[in-house]
Each structure stands twice: as structure tokens, then as C-alpha cells.
Amino acid sequence: NFSLKFIEQSSQIKSFNRNGDSPKVYIADNSEIFIDEIVKEIKLCQEKGFQSICLICKTEKNSTYLFNKIKHKLDIQLIKNGSVSDLQGVFILPVYMSKGLEFDTVLICDADSQNYHDEDDKNLLYVACTRALHKLSLFCENEVSPLI
């Protein structure tokens, strides 16, 4: 199970298998390709019939930045505070707001070495990865996190 690499082996967490493809990691050489790859993946997931698609970023600042880059390319909702009542559609939110939620598809959109590099970040990656019910993709610009 992909997400188990982010927790201590001695933990008493029981995992269960999710249906779907193995997670994919996308590495882009520049920000234009990075945004294009994310938009392409969202559209592909919509074509496959996934009803809830969530883009998860480490921070609210990263979420807002990404939202501003892609809001003109597709219908997406930025969640900054409060709760999400209807999990249908495309959302972007920081990882701390994703705990307890599940989505058909999750795209972790800042999975680079700058954002995820220490033990605390390992726990955040675990939370983000386990939000996906069927499909998980990780995106980074330039250098992938050493935790992945």
C-alpha cells in the first residue's frame, strides 16, 4: 500500500486496499507544464466519470496560488475555511482541511522536496494520500520529495 511508507512500521494502523490504479508521480520541468499536466489529469478523471476530484496542497497559500492559475481553465472550487457539504465536483484545499474527507480522485499538487522533506511532512503526505478512494496522483515541479 503506497501510503504505508509514510507511517512508522510499529504503528497499530490497519490498512485496507482501495480499488484503482497505482499512484502516479508527475514531474514537470516548469510551471507552465506543471499546470497543464494537472488540468489534463483533472479532465481525464472527469471523462472517466469520477464525481469528486480534490487537489490537495500543503498550505492554504499553495492552494490559493494553484487555484488562481487554473480557475480560468476549468470549474473548480477553492476551500479555504469552513466545511465542504457536497463532495461533488472539483475542489482545491490545504491538507489540514482534508482530514476526514474522501474523494474519488486526489491530486497532491506540490509533492516536491521544498514542501515535503521532514517527519511532520511525512504525516501530512499520509493524510493527503489516504483521502483518495480510487485514484491518486502526485505532481511536482522540478524535484520530487525524497519522502515519496
PLM features: residue spans?
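Conserved AAA+ ATPase "SRH/arginine-finger" region at the nucleotide-binding site
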Residues: 27-29
